[in-house]
Design a protein with these regions (language model features):
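Short beta-strand element of the alpha/beta-hydrolase
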Residues: 63-72
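Glycine-rich "HGGG/HGxG" loop immediately N-terminal to the catalytic nucleophile
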Residues: 104-112
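Conserved catalytic-core motifs of eukaryotic protein kinase domains, centered on the activation segment
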Residues: 79-81, 109-110
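Conserved small/polar residues in nucleotide/adenosyl-binding loops
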Residues: 115-117
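N-terminal cap/lid segment of alpha/beta-hydrolase-fold proteins
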Residues: 14-61
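Short amphipathic alpha-helix adjacent to the substrate-entry channel of hydrolases
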Residues: 81-98
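Short beta-to-alpha linker loops that shape the active-site pocket of alpha/beta-hydrolase fold enzymes
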Residues: 57, 96, 101-105
Length: 117
């Protein structure tokens, strides 16, 4: 049974990720947002330990409130790129937004998925 569930999750994740290029075309980042992409936040060369930072262009030296965005997907699917437009819109409201990637189940245990969030 667990192999069936794991296979279903993996297929759902694959199907979900196929929509990423179309989402990038439909949702452009608004002007006035500086993006810093794929910054390593754990020194282990794991692609799942990257974050994106969104900062309003017009206030590079100003202290601003921070939002940490953790993408949804029940720890089994999703990626920070799916929330890129949402994070940019929050940035336009005057926030610095950190959007993190994290390890997913079943490649990693539930605990290892949560430890860096």
């Amino acid at each position: 049974m667990s192999n069936y569930i794991e296979t279903a999750f993996m297929q759902q994740r694959t199907d979900f990720m196929k929509t990423l290029p179309d989402r990038r075309k439909r949702f452009s980042i608004p002007d006035g947002v500086d993006m810093y992409l794929d910054i390593e936040y754990v020194n282990d060369q794991n692609e799942a330990h990257r974050l994106d930072v969104f900062r309003p262009s017009e206030s590079p030296d100003k202290e601003l409130p921070i939002i940490f965005n953790v993408h949804g997907g029940g720890l089994i699917m999703g990626c920070k790129e799916f929330n890129r437009y949402f994070c940019a819109r929050l940035c336009k409201l005057g926030y610095v937004v950190f959007s993190i990637e994290y390890r997913l189940v079943p490649e990693y245990t539930f605990y290892l998925s949560l430890i860096h969030i």
